[in-house]
């Protein structure tokens, strides 16, 4: 019989949320086990857009491509807009390695890759090969198909991002709004340092994946971006938020449904929630301040999406109004805050 192990905190998932949670818990008196089912930390289908949270999470300049000016295409016209908060484009493999390096010297944190979570109970979790781990706190940071979320009986509302990985760096960050092709979804071109992500984000409940792929091809053909030999990949994004704390079990990032259904943005929510959960575990009086702020912007963005979904005849006009409003720093602050 396998010996039962014990950790104060078990974190399932070594993405941005789980790694940030482990980093904040590093150096404390708490014993921490961070597991991930993948052998390598970092790789994930993701466009890579990240608005760096002010004051508590930074990345070296050499890791990102940074864009303060964005280009929006609507109705055959290109609009150029400066944004008050630049968007940083980061490769998820690089981000994972960087975050992992931040916890390597934390003697109270053990990282195990190639380790899957199975049955989950209120005080223990079963891993592959029958290992039983007892815990005081369990943190679900295991993405949109979260095992931890499923153990809590919570459903999902999944959106989808589909992208080509083009092996050359484009020079502009571009957003496509085309209601005839994408409904209330959008397309993007996100240039990384050595490659480009070009994709679409959509709701599969009202917009079939096949149509989304066709729309993406048409958008990129019209823009003149060569993609025929590029790798195509896709991933679900859970946007149904039901809470973070469930007694001694916590959800973070996409496992918590924190990503915005309007933009698909998830990394800033992941980092903030991993940080908040760790702080709450250390000090139970801490009330998840960063996530409460971010949820305010998620709610605003998803209300705008709701209006677009309910008024399909007026989407082109609504997109035009939206672009016009984005020219105003006050609206940018209202829409996405200071994160």
List each language-model region with its residue ranges:
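Active-site-proximal substrate-binding core of FAD-dependent oxidoreductases
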Residues: 240-242, 279-316
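Central beta-strand plus flanking loop segment that forms part of the substrate or channel wall
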Residues: 49, 145-176, 231-238
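Beta1/beta-strand and adjacent pyrophosphate-binding region of the FAD-binding site
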Residues: 2-17
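Conserved N-terminal glycine-rich FAD pyrophosphate-binding loop of Rossmann-like flavoproteins
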Residues: 38-61
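Active-site substrate-recognition segment that forms the wall
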Residues: 178-207
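FAD/FMN-dependent oxidoreductases across multiple families
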Residues: 116, 206-280, 286
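Conserved N-terminal helical subregion
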Residues: 56-59, 63-151, 157-162
């Amino acid at each position: 019989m396998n010996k039962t192990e014990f950790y104060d905190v078990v974190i399932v998932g070594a993405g941005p949320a789980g790694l940030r949670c482990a980093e904040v818990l590093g150096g404390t008196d708490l014993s921490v086990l961070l597991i991930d089912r993948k052998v390598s930390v970092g790789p994930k289908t993701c466009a890579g857009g990240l608005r760096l949270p002010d004051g508590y999470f930074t990345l070296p300049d050499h890791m990102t491509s940074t864009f303060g000016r964005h280009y929006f295409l609507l109705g055959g016209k290109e609009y150029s807009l400066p944004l008050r908060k630049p968007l940083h484009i980061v490769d998820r493999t690089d981000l994972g390695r960087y975050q992992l390096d931040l916890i390597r010297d934390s003697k109270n944190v053990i990282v195990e890759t190639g380790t899957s979570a199975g049955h989950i109970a209120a005080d223990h979790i079963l891993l592959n090969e029958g290992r039983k781990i007892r815990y005081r706190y369990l943190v679900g940071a295991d993405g949109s198909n979260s095992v931890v979320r499923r153990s809590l009986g919570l459903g999902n509302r999944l959106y989808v991002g589909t992208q080509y990985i083009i092996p050359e760096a484009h020079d502009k960050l571009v957003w496509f709004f085309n209601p005839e092709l994408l409904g209330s979804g959008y397309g993007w071109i996100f240039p990384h340092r050595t490659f480009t992500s070009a994709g679409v984000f959509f709701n599969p409940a009202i917009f079939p994946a096949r149509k989304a792929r066709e729309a993406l091809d048409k958008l990129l053909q019209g823009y003149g971006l060569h993609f025929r030999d590029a790798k195509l990949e896709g991933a679900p994004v859970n946007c149904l938020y039901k809470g973070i704390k469930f007694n001694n079990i916590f959800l973070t990032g996409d496992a918590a449904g924190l990503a915005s259904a309007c933009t698909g943005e998830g990394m800033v929510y992941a980092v903030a929630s991993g940080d908040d959960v760790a702080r709450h575990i250390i000090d139970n009086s801490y009330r998840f301040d960063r996530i409460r702020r971010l949820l305010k912007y998620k709610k605003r963005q998803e209300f705008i999406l709701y209006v677009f979904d309910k008024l399909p005849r007026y989407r082109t006009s609504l997109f035009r109004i939206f672009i016009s409003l984005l020219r105003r720093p006050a609206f940018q602050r209202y829409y996405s805050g200071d994160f």
